[in-house]
Every structure is written in C-alpha cells, then in structure tokens.
C-alpha cells in the first residue's frame, strides 16, 4: 500500500533539533558520563601525568648534580625535585583535557556531550552577523546609492574654499582705497602716545672730524700713562735699595 501524501510529507520533514541547556552546579552525571570520567582520570595519569612528571624530576635532578641548580642546606634537592614532579603532573592533566572532551562528544544521550557539541559547532543566534545596534539605517529602505552618497568625503579644496568664503563675509572690509586692512580691526588699534615720543632726547649727529679728534685724545692719554709707568717703577726700586733691611725683611734704621 502506497503512503498517502500527508504521511509522505511527515516522513520528509526533519526531526526538530533538541537544544540542551548547559549543566549547572547541581547536575548529576549519567552512568556513561561517570565511566568516561574514570577513564579520563586513569588515562591522563598513566599516559600523560606520570611520564611528564618523571621526566621533569629526572631533568631537575640532573641539573642539580651538574651544579646549575642549587640545593637547600636543610632539605637538599627534595624541594626542587618535588616541585618539578608537581608541575609535570598538572601539565599532563591539562594536556589530556582535549582528548577527554572528544570522548564526551562521542557519547549518545548525554547532556554534557550535547552541550560540548553545541558549543563547538553552533553559533549563538542572539548575535546575528551583518547588523549593528548602532546603525540607524533601515536595511529594507536603504539603497546602495544612498550608502555610497553618505560615505563620500568632501575634498579638502572645497572645504577650504567654503570656510574661506564664510570667514571673508563676516569681516567688514572698508571700501576706501587708502586702507588695506579691515575697518573693524583698524578701529581697535590704540594710537601711540605723542608725549613719550617728544620727551625722548634726540642725539646730535657726530661728524668725521669730531670722531677723529676724540680717538686721538684717547690715544695720547694711553701713551702718556704707559710712559709714566717705567719711571715710577724705577723710582720705587731706587728707594728700596737706599733703605737697609735686616735678614727678616724689616727696615733697619741707623
């Protein structure tokens, strides 16, 4: 018996996707999930934590024996070796986390596995791509020409010319030919006080002959001072020779 059109449409309709809420704090894992937890704990210890911890402890002990790392005076090399083993244990657990997640994602009828699969595969629909909450343009009414026209940048030359015209209109230039500056600017300039200009004494111009005679006088004065200096020094020396002094430099009077 051939299926009816209604039954055929029901068979062609895909099953609705079941969304699973992420497990909370009070989530109780299923038996399969507990089994995977135990497997992950054992495998991460034997396959990752133990080998990495052993290698770290051996390398640390080798560095201590060569003198690269110093030992404690009380406990010896035990603190550094134990710390290296702990770091290796934690590194092994962290490195096995990706493998454990893959095991949970392969589980069927597992809320935890379904949550992991949705987190890695689906994109949240509450953040649709291509729209912005700050955009005010309606996508149904906006056209490509409008968007292109709104993004056109005005050239610098036109901006400068429009700004220059606006500023030139606001400044009131005078219409007379004798004035080259705006009348509004020239009116604000304070005139210089005439009294100060009149009080300043005017220097009399000096001729070439006057300057020559002044230089000659200064030269003659310098020559006479130089000629008097040797005479004074010779007189002082003669006076010093006539005066008798003792061995201490004191003047000896007879």
Curated annotation (Swiss-Prot):
One of its GO terms (cellular component) is endosome. Residues 1-28, 124-254 are annotated as: Disordered. Residues 1-114 form the OCIA domain. Residues 199-219, 234-247 have a biased composition (Basic and acidic residues). It is found in: Endosome. Its main location: other. The keyword Secreted does not apply. It holds the Pfam family OCIA. Belongs to the OCIAD1 family. This is OCIA domain-containing protein 1. It comes from Xenopus tropicalis (Western clawed frog). The lineage of its organism: Eukaryota, Metazoa, Chordata, Craniata, Vertebrata.
């Amino acid at each position: 018996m051939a299926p009816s059109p209604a039954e055929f449409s029901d068979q062609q309709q895909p099953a609705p996707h079941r969304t699973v809420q992420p497990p909370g704090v009070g989530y109780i894992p299923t038996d399969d999930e507990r089994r995977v937890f135990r497997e992950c704990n054992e495998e991460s210890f034997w396959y990752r934590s133990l080998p990495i911890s052993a290698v770290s402890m051996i390398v640390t002990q080798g560095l201590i024996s060569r003198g690269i790392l110093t030992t404690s005076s009380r406990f010896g090399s035990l603190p550094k070796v134990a710390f290296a083993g702990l770091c290796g244990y934690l590194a092994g657990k962290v490195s096995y986390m990706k493998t454990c997640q893959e095991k949970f994602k392969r589980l069927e009828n597992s809320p935890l596995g379904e949550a992991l699969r949705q987190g890695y595969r689906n994109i949240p629909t509450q953040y649709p791509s291509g729209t912005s909450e700050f955009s005010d343009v309606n996508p149904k009414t906006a056209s490509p020409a409008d968007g292109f026209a709104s993004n056109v940048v005005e050239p610098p030359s036109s901006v400068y010319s429009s700004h220059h015209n606006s500023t030139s209109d606001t400044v009131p230039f005078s219409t007379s030919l004798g004035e080259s500056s705006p009348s509004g600017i020239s009116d604000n300039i304070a005139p210089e006080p005439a009294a100060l200009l009149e009080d300043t004494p005017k220097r009399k111009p000096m001729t070439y002959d006057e300057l020559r005679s002044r230089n000659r006088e200064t030269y003659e004065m310098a020559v006479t001072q130089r000629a008097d200096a040797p005479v004074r020094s010779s007189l002082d020396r003669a006076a010093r020779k006539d005066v008798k002094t003792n061995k201490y430099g004191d003047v000896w009077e007879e």
